[in-house]
Amino acid sequence: AVLTYFVGFNDSMIPESERYDAKETVKSVASSIENNEAVAMKFYSPADGNVVPLTEVSDQAFSSEALGKGIAVRPTNGTIVSPIAGTVSAVYPTAHAYGIKGNNNEEILVHIGIDTVKLEGKYFTPNVKTDDIVMPGDLLATIELDKIIEAGYDPTVMVIDTADSSKRNVTLLAKNTVHAKDDLVLIESI
């Protein structure tokens, strides 16, 4: 429900066959943690650009880490790629956000821009669909970066681990400038 409120959609906008149950995924990861199974995830950069700590993005839902821990990149071009290997679990109708279930059952959110849901898909072209298999660096979407900025929106791309953030440590693997698919962050269970 919190995710629905902040990213601006509801389940009725996604066909039943394309919905995923993030709560079940979070329970699965939490169970692994409780059983002392190590959970470590490396996120690769989703874009060429500048690294921004998640706590410094201009949207409180992300900067407070209420949606989970992660990292952000302010893109310098319109190519957005997958930061992990996995299966696309959701492509939002406005093409500004993507859910990916990783090969180790991690569930991540790739959210393109701040309040860009208000663009209603304008300037976003999805290049994947639900149930597609992706590898780090595979094209998720192309965006018209200049037009998003001209429309007054911050195009920062957030990559969020949606599991219980109180049980996660984040280690930055890159600072300043990155290229798509560069090592970006390591998130480990504690």
Language-model features, listed with the residues they occupy:
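Contiguous, well-folded functional domains in the mature portion of proteins
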Residues: 4-190
